Amino acid sequence: MRPEHWLDMVRCIRENYDRYDGFVITHGTDTMAYTAAALSYLIQGSPKPIILTGAQKPIGFDSTDSKINMTDAFRCAASDLPGVSIVFNNHVILGTRARKTRTKSFQAFSSINYPDLGILRDGVLLRYIRQDCTTVPTFSDTLDNKVALLKLTPGQDRSAADFFLERNDALIIESFGVGGLPEHGGFYDCLQSWIEQGKFVVLTTQVPSEGSDVGVYHVGHSLKAVSYTHLTLPTIL
């Protein structure tokens, strides 16, 4: 899966938007959360459901989860659920909040720092959160792929950040805890210098739940970087 595939999906949905009441996209589970997040921003304000689903076990297996996931996905696509969602193992997850948290279990995805939109029981969609949408959707057809990810480790100096920012327009930094950054090795000066040159630096956390708060530490508070406190990595990307 590559960003150009996301744009292909957007074009397909846009060209057929007036012909159908909902859309189902079957997708591999490894990068499904990235696609759901991307489509959530590339197709905004859709009153029609755009559902992604897949399976942990192939459809040819007796124990496959593909049949129930597909059935649930089409049930949701035929509902009034707006926007982009992942439907998996009876759970309905907002596209910008999904994260793959299990590699083998049927419950492959979790909703991070946000409740499930709903759940399916005996073929009925029970919505926990009702998000009404009556707007006209907007479709985008451009992406900037020059984004890098840096996961901090103890003792890390500025060399990796310099390397990525020389070659990309934006850098996502997975920091420690609520937003801790190294105070040694010129790390702060490195980031501040690149930001002043027009680069985009985003701070998030390696911890999956409860988000970040870069203002807790002085080095994070004084840095002129963007902080997304409760979003998943695929959504930030």
Identify the meaning behind each predicted range.
Residues L52-R121:
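Internal gly/pro-rich beta-alpha loop/helix module
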